Amino acid sequence: MIVFRRFPTCLLHHIRQPASRSLLLESQRRSLSFTSYKYNSSHIDDDKSKKKLKNVFQMNSNRVIRKQKTKEELAKERFEEQLRSPNRFVRWGAIARSEKFSKGMTKYMIGAYVIFLIYGLFFTKKLFAKDKELERLLKKQEEGNANEYEALRIKELKGKLRRRDELKLEEYKKMQEEGIENFDDIRVQNFDQNKLNEQILPARDTTNFYQEKANEYDKAINMEERVIFLGKRRKWLMKHCQGDVLEVSCGTGRNIKYLDMSRINSITFLDSSENMMEITHKKFREKFPKYKKVAFVVGKAENLVDLAEKGKPSLENEKENQVKYDTIVEAFGLCSHEDPVKALNNFGKLLKPDGRIILLEHGRGQYDFINKILDNRAERRLNTWGCRWNLDLGEVLDDSDLELVEEKRTHLGTTWCIVAKRKGDVKKKDELGFVEKYLQSSIRKRMESFEKKDDMASKKELEPVPPVSKS
């Protein structure tokens, strides 16, 4: 009898699939062997890297590894290098940025301020003393009691000494050193540069010269004026024109393009050359064809007063018989006049009260080397342009009856920009300088207040003390 036993299902599953199990075991074995290989190989790589690092460390055992510096440390090193720099300006710059210098700067500032105050005090006292001396001398001059030395001293205090005045003042100072103090009856010889300088040629009548030069004058002079930017100066000259205007030595009318007719009531042109006056007339009519209050007169500046009176009805009062102008202008005319001082005096006679004379001229410069050049080329200049460009215009102005309001010089002092008035006329507000307008008056008032306080204090000290009553 055959007996069949029932096996469990799980056991039958394993018996029936022997191949699949063997495959599973094989895959597990391979996985384990691969892991072992990776582990072993990683150990091998670690050993190689360790050996390599060991070799590198042995090679670089003498090299010093430094810590990376901060910005502050780098800036400090750079500052120390600048302090040791061979360039002095670099060293000074580093010192100025140092902490020690910054701390001491306050002391320097305080010291500088104290020095400034002390200097300002002495300067103010000196300025006040000069102002008081000038006031005293001017008062004496108005009374007609000032001698020649005092007149020169007035010019020196005003800063208006000419070369001949400097030479005269030197003679008076020599007398002072010898012990002479009273100069009332003493007069020093004149050192007129316009007469003593042989390079300054004598004046002559230039009418015929400019008659022949008229047609080519503008073309010949254009380049010279452009090089020295003379148009700017001509513009300055004509901007002063207002009211009734007279232009003397108008030439070919080179100033017409700078006229502002909205500020002008009437205008008169004067020149000794008829040919030049025709060119002026043509230029004016081209620019202002409808303007009616204009006159073109041919004549000399030395005969200006006679020309103004010509054709006028005679009146009992001669002054009312003359034509008067608010503004008289002239550009480069004094150097061509036969008598420049007389011409200036004529300007003053035809000027209205509070009127102004505006001059643009050339003459001697402010430096000796430029004056030597002018002297050496004086004859050539006279023959080419008909002018004496090395005249000392300061002497000419001082010898006239005019009083200077403004004097500016350019081109090394050879170009003179002058504003003048009649003697006795008061300066306008806009003609007062900053020092004259604000500083001198305030300093005078301040110092006078100090003097009053000192006088009051001295009077109190001199007053008798009342006796104390005994009770």
UniProtKB/Swiss-Prot annotation:
Enzyme Commission number(s) from the entry: 2.1.1.-
UniProt entry keywords in alphabetical sequence: Membrane, Methyltransferase, Mitochondrion, Mitochondrion inner membrane, Transferase, Transit peptide, Transmembrane, Transmembrane helix
Enzyme class label: transferase
One term of GO molecular function: S-adenosylmethionine-dependent methyltransferase activity
Ranges of compositional bias, category Basic and acidic residues: 450-463
Coiled coil: none
Membrane topology, Mitochondrial matrix segments: 40-103
Gene Ontology cellular component terms for the protein in this record: mitochondrial envelope; mitochondrial inner membrane; mitochondrion
Primary subcellular site in the record, as a coarse category: mitochondrion
Transmembrane intervals: 104-123
Region (Disordered): 450-471
Topological category with respect to the lipid bilayer: Single-pass membrane protein
Intracellular or extracellular location(s): Mitochondrion inner membrane
Mitochondrial intermembrane side: 124-471
Transit peptide: 1-39
Annotated GO biological process: methylation
Recorded family membership: Belongs to the methyltransferase superfamily. METL family.
Record function comment: Mitochondrial methyltransferase which suppresses respiratory defects caused by OXA1 mutations when overexpressed.
Additional free-text comment from the UniProt record: Present with 504 molecules/cell in log phase SD medium.
Protein name: Methyltransferase OMS1, mitochondrial
Organism (species): Saccharomyces cerevisiae (strain ATCC 204508 / S288c)
Gene designation: OMS1
